[in-house]
């Protein structure tokens, strides 16, 4: 039903019309009212009991209804608007902000509707918007997945930054690099747990040709942040080696996690710890860098094949 409404709206006016349907309708709560004439009479009577200031053009202007009207407007708070639920907010939000709010609200419906336009429509309805707001997203499912990955990366960066501040303040000890990398990757992958049953579908979308550039950008940015907060200051070829290796470790651990039925994914974290320990003993030769890069590409291709086999499974084995 939501998709049909969205198509009709698109035909009628396109993206802007969808925005008008989804966006909260502003209702001016405090309309300007001209002050009654008796106000001026009362003010004049009161002013007679006070010392009159010297006459000037400014004071003459101040006594006019036009000036009082201007002062009244300046003293009023900014117009406030209400949505369908009667909640107030000031001003408008941009199209991007509106989309981000809808996508964030849609995440709670992923377990029931998957990474789909239906989940987005439910998210819009939870914000008291029209389900037709799902039509704002040309590739709903993929945009929802990319939004989630971006959100998770931001949360990880905040965690790592907070940990760094505690170390700088002396309230926490700096972790060995091996432990730091393991904890960072584990923290990031744990963010998938609420959607673990739907994650094969998400990975399949991330590996679609049209989404690979965005997926790789998010992945490499996340890995770079982890190494940055780990204290990596290398400027030689090892800079590339370390990031390529950690990228491969993250991808393979993510696939292991999808098939892990152990309590709290214990087998996954053990696998991760072993791979991190092995990686820290690697050399930094150019030959190893090249082979590592090839391994990452092969890993992505292998992931696509694995996901093809995993797609459709509703439960982990």
Curated annotation (Swiss-Prot):
This is Ubiquinone biosynthesis protein COQ9, mitochondrial. The keyword Mitochondrion applies. Belongs to the COQ9 family. GO terms for biological process: ubiquinone biosynthetic process. It holds the Pfam family COQ9_N. The gene is coq9. A 1,2-diacylglycero-3-phosphoethanolamine binds at residue 243. GO terms for cellular component: mitochondrion. Homodimer. Heterodimer; two heterodimers of COQ7:COQ9 come together on the same side of the lipid pseudo-bilayer and form a curved tetramer with a hydrophobic surface suitable for membrane interaction. These two tetramers assemble into a soluble octamer with a pseudo-bilayer of lipids captured within. Interacts with COQ7; this interaction allows ubiquinone (CoQ) isoprene intermediates presentation to COQ7 and facilitates the COQ7-mediated hydroxylase step. Residues 1-46 form a transit peptide. Keywords: Lipid-binding, Mitochondrion, Transit peptide, Ubiquinone biosynthesis.
